[in-house]
Amino acid sequence: MSKSIENDTWIYVIVKSAGSNDHLAGLHDDVDNLNFIPCFFEKDHAGTCLAHMFDNGKDAYEVQAILYEELSSYAKKNGFMVYILDFKGNIINKIKP
């Protein structure tokens, strides 16, 4: 199923909690040699993928909702692509903000 994503669409991202220095968690796509921020349409999908993508046992991560417009702005400013993923971590869409 493909959903439309607009600036006012709420999506879910993974945030690395570092006290007062929380930030969006990003990954590197070795195939395309790009840094990206994974995002999800469903909170439980983000939670499922969090355990597989980021749980290293020492850093704290959590799922948070964000407006796509804010995510896109953050990604553009910091040189990231935005990848929309499904519950298995498969790429649904790659977006250059």
Locate predicted features.
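Conserved NAD+-utilizing ADP-ribose enzyme module
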Residues: M1-P97
